[in-house]
């Protein structure tokens, strides 16, 4: 099949993070600081990505501001002609630090928020962070950069959807993404504590719809549904190895940020193989491209080019088979697995297991 060049690179510069969010989708086993790619290696990755056709670079983590070479990496990506987006907790994003990044070509900031007020947000983040995030947002707007606010929704903050929208308005956000938790990595460990109730989901959707209509043309609102409760799966990555690739802190190259969960796939790394060769020719990137890998019901389903069989990582985590129909799909023979999870986990009083920093020091 014909393979197009990727549009975007998610550069996960580090797994280190000042927050301890229970919904973190990074792997349970994090990359230690000593095993992160060096500055020179990241510069080579950026060069190779641009040669491959990448136009957007999203610098993320962990917390990318913990890399002292961040201005150099932003500058290289910008000099190559890429649109550079910083995905950050905001901790450490002072006006002077931001000015240095803007001077090097930073074009956009995505800022995570955990709740609509400091008490709730700081409890979820496991750190006193909320007020510092608001200061970071003020700095972004003062610098003239577009601001996106990202909120991961779960049982502990779903009742704040309306207040979160109002908060994003006050922050001057251009875009608000309200994304229900995806259960990968550390978040999977906390699924029973994170899964919202049906009542919470039903209450949130009309609030989001009304706000999206009211704010049309002023603030874009993107609502990512809780796919466990949907009839069909989300079109994960708009197809495996189709639009974007991820380079993890240690150089592993992934078709999606959570793909390391599929332990049956070989792991490619930029230290052993070129980015171009990985994108076009590796087993891991070609495993689920197109629809030739599909089995029924996906193979003969009219939605196979709409949702692409759903999420490969979710299929593997719930069934042990990455080629299975995503079990959140109502047509999946494994839908009962998801129904049982909803029945047993969506309304139990389970405490968070907070993410700790020790593994990445």
For the regions a protein language model found, what residue spans apply to each?
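Short strand-loop junctions, especially beta-strand C-caps/beta-turns
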Residues: 27, 62, 152-154, 316
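Conserved alpha-helical substructure of the radical SAM core
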Residues: 1-104, 108
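Short, conserved clusters of charged catalytic residues that mark active-site
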Residues: 8, 40-44, 93-96, 132, ...
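Radical SAM enzyme [4Fe-4S]-AdoMet core and its adjacent flexible, acidic
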Residues: 37, 83, 99, 103-104, ...
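Flexible loop residues that form catalytic
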Residues: 29, 62, 114, 181, ...
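Flexible mid-to-C-terminal extensions adjoining Fe-S/redox cofactors in radical SAM and related proteins
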Residues: 1, 260-361
């Amino acid at each position: 099949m014909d393979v197009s060049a990727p549009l975007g690179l998610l550069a996960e510069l580090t797994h280190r993070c000042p927050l301890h969010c229970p919904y973190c989708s990074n792997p349970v086993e994090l990359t230690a600081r000593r095993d992160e790619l060096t500055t020179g290696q990241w510069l080579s990755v950026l060069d190779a990505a641009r040669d491959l056709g990448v136009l957007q670079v999203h610098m993320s983590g962990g917390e990318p501001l913990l890399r002292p070479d961040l201005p150099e990496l932003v500058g290289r990506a910008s000099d190559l002609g890429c649109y550079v987006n910083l995905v950050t907790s905001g901790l450490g994003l002072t006006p002077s630090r931001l000015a240095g990044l803007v001077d090097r070509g930073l074009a956009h900031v995505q800022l995570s928020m955990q709740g609509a007020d400091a008490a709730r947000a700081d409890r979820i983040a496991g750190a006193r962070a909320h007020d510092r995030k608001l200061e970071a947002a003020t700095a972004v707007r003062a610098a003239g950069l577009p601001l996106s606010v990202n909120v991961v929704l779960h049982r502990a903050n779903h009742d704040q959807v309306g207040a979160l929208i109002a908060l994003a308005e006050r922050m001057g956000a251009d875009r608000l993404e309200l994304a229900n938790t995806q259960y990968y990595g550390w978040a999977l460990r906390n699924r029973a504590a994170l899964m919202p109730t049906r009542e919470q989901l039903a209450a949130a959707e009309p609030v989001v719809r009304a706000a999206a209509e009211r704010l049309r043309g002023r603030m874009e609102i993107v609502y990512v549904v809780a796919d466990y409760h949907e009839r069909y799966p989300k079109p994960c990555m708009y197809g495996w190895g189709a639009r974007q690739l991820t380079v993890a802190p240690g150089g592993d190259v992934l078709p999606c940020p959570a793909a390391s969960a599929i332990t049956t796939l070989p792991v490619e790394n930029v230290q052993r193989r070129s980015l171009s060769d990985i994108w076009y020719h590796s087993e891991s990137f070609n495993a689920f491209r197109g629809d030739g890998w599909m089995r029924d019901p996906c193979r003969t389903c009219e939605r196979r080019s709409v949702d692409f069989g759903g999420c490969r990582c979710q299929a593997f985590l719930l069934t042990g088979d990455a080629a299975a129909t995503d079990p959140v799909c109502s047509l999946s023979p494994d839908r009962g697995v998801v129904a049982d999870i909803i029945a047993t986990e969506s309304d139990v009083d389970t405490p968070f297991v907070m993410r700790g920093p020790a593994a990445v020091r």
